[in-house]
Every structure is written in structure tokens, then in C-alpha cells.
Amino acid sequence: PIQIFETPVQKLGSYDKENHFYMKRDDLLPFSFGGNKVRFAREFVEDMKEKHCDSMIIYGNYHSNLCRILATLCHQLSVPCYMIHNTEDIKDNCETNNSRIIRRMGVREIRCGKQTIAEAVQTAMDELTEKGYRPYYIYGNTRGEGNEHIPMRSYEKTYDELYNWEKENHTFFDYIFLASSTNATQSGLLAGSLKYEDNCKIVGISVSRNEKRGKEVIAGN
């Protein structure tokens, strides 16, 4: 149900006469209100199918864009979906559009704290296995290791779109700025830049991790 197309690059108006600003319009991706996590979700579900799994375990909270998109995708595919909900992550319990959508998608919630995430993932895996399913955890094993490359490759592919756009429009980017949380989008863009050896600077503006931890994650990816 997820159709990925080459999203447009739009020039933005600016009073800055020395620099030109452009935006890659991934908000136009036509699934569950769009955004970069749509590309992640497409890669996760394809990987799930390649591994012959038939149920999905997601991780996050009710404010998460990725959880919203994956919950919607599982609902459309009639795939059982369990959400590992770290209740220590976000204290705010107010209703949002994300939380309303997730709750309506029939997600089975398993609550945990920061120190019990692995146990919660194992509980979800055991429950699904007992029901006869082959569970797929989006982040790999119970420690969240093994699938780092899956969301990354979605934005390595997106870099191909940017590279082709640059050649077609004879306009070449010096910098790419993005909001960076789990660092998967940034890692994928860096992989694309390294592939083409174009020396474009990929600058992540962290919305969660500190600089030291962000660099460690990117280096590990």
C-alpha cells in the first residue's frame, strides 16, 4: 500500500541574497500524512516479507510518527502489530492525532521502562510465537541490534534522487540540513554522499540525542 515516488525539490523564498534554499518535499508521500518515516516503513515491511515474518513489533510511543505509520500499514495489511511503549520516554499523556490514529489501528501495547525494553520485546515475540506467528522486530534482536541498515538504506536511495536532480537542474548542494533523532536518515544520506564522493556536508539538527551520542551512532552505522 505504500507507493514511493521521486518527491519534488522546491526552491524556497528567502531574503538571503548570498544563499539559496531548497526543500525535498517528502511530506507529499501519499501514505499516513507523509514524511521521512514513510520511506522507513516501506523498507521495514519489505524486509519483514523477505524474512518470511507475518507480524510486526514496533517500538516507540503514542506521539511517534513512525509508530503511526507502521500501525496504519499493519492495519491495512491485516498484520498483527505489537507496540513496545517505553513509558519513561515521554511523560506527556495528552491526546494527539498520532495517538488517536495508533489507538484505532488495533495495536497491542506492551509497556516498559528504559531498563526493561529487551524483556518487553521478548514478551511480544513469545506471545506472537505462541499464537503461531513469525514476529519481526523492526530494530532486530531484543537489544535493538541488527536492523540498523534497514531505515538507513531508504535515504541512501533518496540521495540517488537528489544526485539526479542536481545533474538535471545544474544546481549542486553544498549542505543538507535535517532534523535528526535516531540518526538513521542522516546515516543514509551520508552513505549516499560517500557513494558519489560529492563532499556535500550533511548536518543533523538533533531533536533527542546529544552530539557525542549522535556521532557514536552514526559511526557505528
Question: Model-predicted segments: where are they?
Answer:
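PLP-dependent amino-acid enzyme catalytic core
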Residues: 1-221
